Design a protein with these regions (language model features):
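Intrinsic-disorder/low-complexity detector
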Residues: 2-102
Length: 102
């Protein structure tokens, strides 16, 4: 067998593997660097970041990158965006780690 071919196929399979998270009956594509769901600054990303840093549940997101674009608060978010934030928060609560402030 051609080891280069095997290596290439293995790499392709790893890249093709999708990661999903289901929360409150909704399944989210959380494939890093491939899914709009986990884009930096989006509701899912902000929820997971708030959980990671030990912050309170406070739905928000950024139109673009975090800190470099307009911040949208809960009152301006759609119900779907609030659910996406909540899913990100819960995702990190279940599978993520927490910032070591130590």
């Amino acid at each position: 067998m051609n080891l280069t071919l095997i290596s290439s196929v293995t790499k392709d399979l790893k890249m093709a593997k999708k990661e999903y998270f289901t929360h409150q009956g909704i399944t989210y594509d959380v494939t890093f660097n491939e899914s709009e769901t986990v884009r930096h600054g989006g509701p899912f990303d902000r929820g997971s970041a708030d959980s990671y840093y030990g912050r309170m549940w406070n739905p928000h997101y950024y139109v673009g990158n975090t800190g470099f674009s307009d911040r949208i608060e809960k009152e301006e978010m759609t119900p779907e965006q609030v659910r996406e934030y909540d899913a990100g928060y819960e995702y990190n609560e279940q599978f993520g780690d927490k910032k070591d402030w130590g």
